[in-house]
Design a protein with these regions (language model features):
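Small-residue (G/A/S/T)-rich helix-start motifs and N-terminal tracts that mark the onset
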Residues: 1-75
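Anionic group-transfer/hydrolysis microenvironments
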Residues: 10, 79-81, 91
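Hydrophobic alpha-helical segments, especially transmembrane helices
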Residues: 26, 78, 92-95
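Glycine/small-residue-rich loop that forms an oxyanion/phosphate-binding "nest" at active or ligand-binding sites
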Residues: 73-87
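Single conserved hydrophobic/aromatic residue that forms the stacking wall/gate
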Residues: 85-97
Length: 97
């Protein structure tokens, strides 16, 4: 039996309580292998957000595409998408695969 592969498209939370870090922990707990596409980096702790830096949408799109090209992704979970409205949607990227 192979391990199912999923991808999370989300922000990075330095306190690991949310964002792609939490998604990685949840996927692991459910027996899945998780890939990531980082949309932004957030400086935060519970109850405090000090800064958000978006990742260039073209780089986010490239992360999604390369994961879809090289791994048998069976599910995609989205979180904080930041400025992804300026690039193709994850659904459009899946169609172009």
């Amino acid at each position: 039996m192979s391990i199912p592969v999923m991808m999370t498209i989300a922000g990075s939370d330095c306190s690991a309580g949310a964002g792609l870090q939490a998604d990685l922990k949840a996927a692991h707990a459910m027996g899945a292998f998780a890939l990531t596409a980082v949309t932004c980096v957030v400086s935060e702790a519970p109850g405090t957000v000090r800064g958000i830096q978006e990742v260039d949408p073209a780089l986010v799109a490239d992360q999604v595409r390369i994961n879809l090209e090289h791994f048998p992704v069976r599910a995609v979970k989205t979180g904080m998408l930041c400025l992804l409205y300026t690039s193709p949607s994850p659904r459009d990227m899946r169609r172009s695969r």
